[in-house]
């Protein structure tokens, strides 16, 4: 009985090593996408529907609207501009923090 188990164990170990070395389905899709991106030229990249990662992350990180200079100028001092920026920031925070009634509670 012990003699028959040894080849079975070796086959299981070899099978486990082969399966673990193969890329999973998720990572193989990523590998295909990387190969496609490498093959694109600059013009094709501009035409592609997938936005470039650095372009989207840079644009989303930038503040919205016009940001005034923080240095003093002929029109006023930086404290006035800082107050405007603070009020703009508080208005956006207020928009996110508004309380909404729960749908389970009555009127």
Swiss-Prot record:
Residues 1-21 form the signal peptide. Keywords: Apoplast, Developmental protein, Glycoprotein, Hormone, Hydroxylation, Secreted, Signal. The mature small signaling peptide is generated by proteolytic processing of the longer precursor. Glycans are attached at residue 39. GO terms for cellular component: apoplast. The modification Hydroxyproline is found at residues 101, 103. Residues 43-76 are annotated as: Disordered. One of its GO terms (molecular function) is hormone activity. Disulfide bonds: none annotated. InterPro entries: CEP13/CEP14. GO terms for biological process: cellular response to nitrogen starvation; nitrate import; regulation of root development; response to carbon dioxide; response to osmotic stress. Residues 22-92 form a propeptide. Induction: Slightly repressed in roots by carbon dioxide CO(2). Induced in shoots by osmotic stress (e.g. mannitol). Belongs to the C-terminally encoded plant signaling peptide (CEP) family. Extracellular signaling peptide that may regulate primary root growth rate and systemic nitrogen (N)-demand signaling. Interacts with CEP receptors (e.g. CEPR1 and CEPR2). This is Precursor of CEP14. It comes from Arabidopsis thaliana (Mouse-ear cress).
């Amino acid at each position: 009985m012990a003699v028959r188990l040894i080849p079975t164990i070796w086959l299981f170990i070899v099978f486990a090593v082969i399966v673990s070395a193969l890329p999973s389905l998720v990572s193989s899709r990523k590998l295909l996408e990387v190969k496609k991106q490498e093959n694109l030229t600059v013009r094709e990249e501009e035409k592609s529907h997938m936005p470039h990662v650095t372009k989207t992350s840079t644009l989303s990180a930038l503040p919205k609207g016009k940001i005034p200079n923080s240095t003093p100028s002929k029109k006023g001092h930086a404290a006035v501009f800082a107050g405007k920026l603070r009020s703009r920031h508080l208005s956006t925070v207020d928009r996110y923090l508004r309380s909404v009634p729960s749908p389970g509670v009555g009127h």
